[in-house]
Amino acid sequence: MNRIKAVVLDLGNVLVFHDDLVLFQRLSAWGGAAPEHIRKRMLELWDAINRGSLAGDELRRAVCRVAGSEVPMDAEAFYALWNCHFRVHHEILPTVDALFGRVKVILLTNVNEMHWRFVRPLIAQFERFDDLVISCDLRLAKPDPEIFQATLARSTLRPEETAYFDDVPRYIEVARALGIQARVFTTAPTFRTQLAELGVVV
């Protein structure tokens, strides 16, 4: 097995938890559309949101329409509601701390500008990451292989020397097809075990 030189981490449900049902329920309470209706309609929007092609006031108006209102809430209220469903996954952070100095630590995430602006200050460790690969900045999003290739290229990494952790199996499959040592993330203890199996003992 090749020695792992970099660990690439997803954001949602790895470093932070995000309960989309909470978001949809809050949007429902504000706009009147049913949470399930909101969930289904948002499925049509997430790719554009993650790629940054739907952003800012346009994003706010689109989400408010999905919630059932042609009149959008004001920007400050929307920002608070749009970020209501995040909480830091504190249990994983000591393991992340232990990776610094051993391997490169990189973030690769599908995220929009407003979510990233809210989440980034919550985790001080981001200041120590070797790279932060943000989908809306690149105008690329998982599962597009290009965003994985861009992540490798930006840090001059070989895929076989790169470990990648994500909670979405479909993204793991794409990464593996590119030769990346990808694993489905489930829990912090399992993450430590997976690292050890890859030769990264922390």
Where are these regions (language model features)?
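Short amphipathic alpha-helical segments and helix-helix/interface helices
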Residues: 93-97, 172
